[in-house]
Amino acid sequence: HIQKGNLSVCIDTSPDIKYQFLKNKIKNLDSIIYTHEHADQTVGIFEMRPFYWKNKGKIPIYGSSRTIKALKNSYKFCFKEKQGYPPIMKANVIKNNFFIKKNKIKLSIKAFDVNHGLINATGYVMEKIAYISDCNNVPLKNLKYLKDLNYLIVDCLKLNKHPSHFNLEDAMNLINLVKPKKAILTNLHIDLDYFRLKKILPANVFPAHDGL
């Protein structure tokens, strides 16, 4: 979740998003950015309906053409009128650079492809913060987006190699290559213990946790 002034933007809608919003006292939502169409990134979309009513209008969502097409196919009720159930989402296919604006607040965003197994997911850079949630490779041509970062939030699913996600070695290789001021490892699976990671990671690299 990104908060800039009174602009509230969520990245993906995970299955537990209602719990996360309640626990972290997030009461407003203006837009949603999607990294890709897999269920663990999207199935919480139905929990967003209260924000449609609160905002008195459709919630703008952003994603690649592939992601938006998949969302429209999987969650038709969010986009098509049905008696008694108005569409709650307005879909926007992103380009490399776009922005989200609310009143005088503007969030500038750069989007780029990353490899995630058999598909491409989208990485985002928002004002010196990069977010790469599900990824097993960042194409060389897209490393330019990861220069001069304050924070790199990066996939780190497992200790051992995985066909569609970074493991710890992969994540650290990217961190050492692009040299952000700080890095946060996310998407941690059960074989990556939080407290053990804290002991072995460099001082500027942190394991993520709920509510961070």
Model-derived features with residue positions:
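Binuclear metal-ion centers of metallo-dependent hydrolases, dominated by the metallo-beta-lactamase
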Residues: P139-L212
